[in-house]
């Protein structure tokens, strides 16, 4: 929580005023039993009606002043806690944006969503209640004790004996609860992860008739969370009954001792009522303190999880250079690159070296899991290789700022991702200042012009979240158009035309080849037909570069490429040989 307290600095005044007004409220509360005692001792016993009326209006005034202090304290506490939560949430979100894909893969999207929402909301609740009650409850308890000593020392000793026992019970339960609340939040992460996984993959689950297994898996995780919460709840539930039992025992001793003191004439009946009122105040405040401790325990556990995100340092150090024009003909070069994903047992890429000249089209092909997507993800520096270097225009990509790389490299990934809003808004992710003419130019090159023209409102057509109101092929073409809007020097198409038919795919490749500006294109595909016209083709096999060259050269020299070709064009290579004879 100490690390997060810096986000309260902007609200220092509110954080001081909230407990201050609560303490003022406490002062009025502690004076009430004394006024009641005076009403009984002087007004009732002495039959002094003037004192009764005076005390009556004094109690009303104190109640109104206490209410005003309470409302003011709540106002300042709410301002401080909501502002703190907003700043903290923004800080965590901004920090996540600095993460490389390595940290994003390690932490997981579901965990970060939980920490940005549920955890920060819980911390906000803890700050709000802490500002209002953390000082109030102990102040009432010790204030009531001091007031009891001013009335009668012997009776006050019962208070002095009961309070430490109550604190021991409360803090013992708190120490047991804190680790359990942390486990509960981890179990909640698991349930959130399964929920997200099942909702996003519902079509696949139904296609394979896996509904029953998904329900069973979710039920197991949900039951584990429920059992843990029930166990924590049972421990937390001990607070109220234990404190009530201890206070009631103390009350019995108090009444017994007070009765003796009254009979001896040491104290008046009104003083006994005041002592009992102070005991009741202690009961109420200790119950509040117990509830506060439960809330703070949850908040501290959540604060630790949020702080863990802020303490996670990005594994990449961002460069500062911009990508300027270079005399180098080399657009992209890999020099003995080896890359391993965090937690993976074996490298995904091993000793990869190649060069791509400016304006060339580079095809990348290989089996599933051969490292095709991993290779192209190193170019925009989504990841850093453990060995070797990746160069753009002759310079190491680590030297460039993220903004510079983003401006020069356009990436269209396997899964087309569109956002809720108009088509125009989505396309302008590539260039927020792009004119409509530039948008239509990119749409035409991506073979998406007819798609947009057929929609009501055309560029103003509203897309649903994730582009749910478009087909797979339409989403892919709009994603390609979005990348083309910023006119990148390097364009990466990571199997991004898999949902297109052969004719549309061929037209797309042709239009990209003849763009009005020079672009180095990387085409990742499972289909030889998509890459056979490339200037250079890279063949990957389990992370190794099995071959590189033109289509014809690989047909003659690369067994793996020959195997892939024969599987997609059976008999064609043999027929060509026969025709050559």
Residue ranges and their predicted role:
Residues 1-12, 112:
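A short amphipathic helical element positioned immediately N-terminal to and/or at the very start
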Residues 9, 15-72, 76, 149-154, ...:
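Transmembrane helix-loop-helix hairpins at lipid-water interfaces of multipass membrane proteins
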Residues 20, 24, 28-32, 57, ...:
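Hydrophobic alpha-helical transmembrane segments of ABC transporter permease domains
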Residues 47-54, 61, 147-161, 231-305, ...:
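Helix-loop-helix
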Residues 92, 96, 205, 226, ...:
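Helix-loop junctions and hydrophobic alpha-helical segments within the transmembrane domains
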């Amino acid at each position: 929580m100490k690390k997060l307290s810096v986000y309260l600095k902007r609200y220092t005044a509110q954080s001081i005023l909230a407990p201050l007004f609560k303490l003022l409220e406490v002062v009025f509360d502690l004076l009430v039993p004394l006024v009641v005692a005076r009403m009984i001792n002087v007004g009732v016993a002495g039959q002094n009606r003037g004192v009764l009326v005076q005390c009556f209006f004094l109690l009303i005034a104190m109640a109104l002043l206490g209410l005003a202090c309470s409302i003011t304290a709540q106002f300042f506490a709410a301002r401080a806690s909501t502002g703190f939560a907003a700043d903290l949430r923004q800080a965590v979100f901004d920090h996540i944006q600095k993460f490389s894909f390595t940290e994003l893969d390690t932490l997981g999207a579901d965990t970060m969503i939980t920490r940005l929402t549920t955890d920060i909301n819980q911390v906000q609740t803890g700050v709000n209640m802490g500002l209002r009650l953390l000082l109030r409850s102990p102040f009432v308890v010790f204030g009531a004790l001091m007031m009891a000593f001013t009335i009668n020392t012997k009776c006050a000793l019962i208070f002095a004996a009961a309070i430490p026992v109550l604190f021991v019970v409360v803090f013992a339960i708190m120490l047991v609860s804190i680790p359990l609340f942390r486990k509960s939040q981890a179990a909640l992460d698991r349930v959130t992860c399964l929920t997200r996984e099942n909702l996003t993959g519902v079509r696949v689950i139904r296609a394979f008739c896996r509904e029953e297994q998904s329900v069973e898996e979710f039920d197991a995780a949900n039951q584990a969370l429920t059992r843990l919460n029930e166990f924590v709840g049972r421990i937390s539930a001990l607070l109220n009954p234990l404190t009530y039992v201890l206070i009631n025992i103390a009350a019995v001793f108090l009444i017994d001792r007070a009765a003796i003191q009254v009979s001896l004439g040491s104290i008046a009946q009104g003083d006994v009522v005041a002592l009992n009122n102070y005991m009741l105040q202690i009961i109420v405040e200790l119950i509040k303190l117990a509830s506060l401790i439960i809330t703070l325990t949850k908040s501290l556990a959540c604060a630790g999880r949020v702080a863990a995100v802020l303490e996670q340092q990005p594994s990449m150090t961002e460069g500062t250079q911009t990508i300027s024009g270079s005399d180098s003909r080399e657009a992209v070069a890999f020099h003995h690159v080896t890359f391993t994903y965090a937690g993976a047992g074996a490298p995904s890429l091993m000793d990869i070296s190649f060069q791509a000249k400016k304006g060339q089209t580079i095809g990348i092909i290989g089996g599933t899991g051969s490292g095709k997507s991993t290779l192209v993800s190193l170019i925009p520096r989504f990841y850093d290789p453990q060995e070797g270097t990746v160069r753009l225009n002759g310079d190491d990509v680590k030297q460039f700022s993220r903004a510079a790389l983003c401006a020069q490299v356009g990436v269209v990934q396997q899964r087309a991702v569109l956002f809720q809003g108009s088509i125009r808004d989505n396309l302008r992710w590539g260039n927020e200042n792009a004119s409509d003419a530039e948008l239509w130019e990119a749409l035409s090159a991506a073979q998406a012009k007819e798609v947009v023209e057929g929609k009501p409102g055309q560029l103003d057509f509203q897309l649903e979240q994730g582009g749910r109101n478009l087909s797979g092929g339409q989403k892919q073409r709009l994603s390609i158009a979005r990348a083309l809007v910023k006119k990148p020097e390097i364009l990466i198409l990571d199997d991004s035309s898999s949902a297109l038919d052969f004719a549309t795919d061929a037209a797309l490749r042709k239009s990209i080849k003849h763009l009005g500006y020079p672009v180095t294109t990387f085409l990742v595909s499972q289909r030889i037909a998509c890459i056979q016209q490339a200037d250079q083709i890279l063949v990957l096999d389990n992370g190794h570069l099995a071959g590189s060259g033109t289509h014809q050269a690989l047909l003659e020299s690369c067994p793996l490429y020959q195997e892939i070709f024969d599987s997609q064009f059976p008999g064609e290579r043999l027929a060509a040989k026969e025709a050559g004879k």
